[in-house]
Amino acid sequence: MILMPFLLLMQSSDAETYDTLLRCAAFHTIEAERLVRDEGAAAGDAQNATANDFTQTARAMLSEDNDANAVETDLAQRKAEYLDTLAKGEVNEVAAQWTALELACKELYPMLSRINADSISGESR
């Protein structure tokens, strides 16, 4: 009986982590698009690479029975939410959300490093 609430807690945490990964990917994708628009094609490369890392990590969290397009669909939804908020011109809200998001993304960087290291060591075997 004690195991069930623990499992539910773990699922919630995984869902929150998945959502944060996608929000970070959306954030970096939008930043890449802005940099490309403002500074040229190569300027967004680092942001796109970071967005890809977050997206790949989110994809790795999904079980194999999930739709292959689930991550892309979820990512597009998060990105649309951010772009809608930006379009409304709610600058203070965007700044507050993105400051919180930037902190959340920074907390996930160690996980990205571990996953990347594991995948690299798995490829070299």
Annotate each language-model stretch with its function:
Residues 13-14, 94:
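Residues embedded in well-ordered secondary-structure elements
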Residues 5-7, 29-30, 110:
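Residue-level marker of positions within ordered structural domains that often coincide
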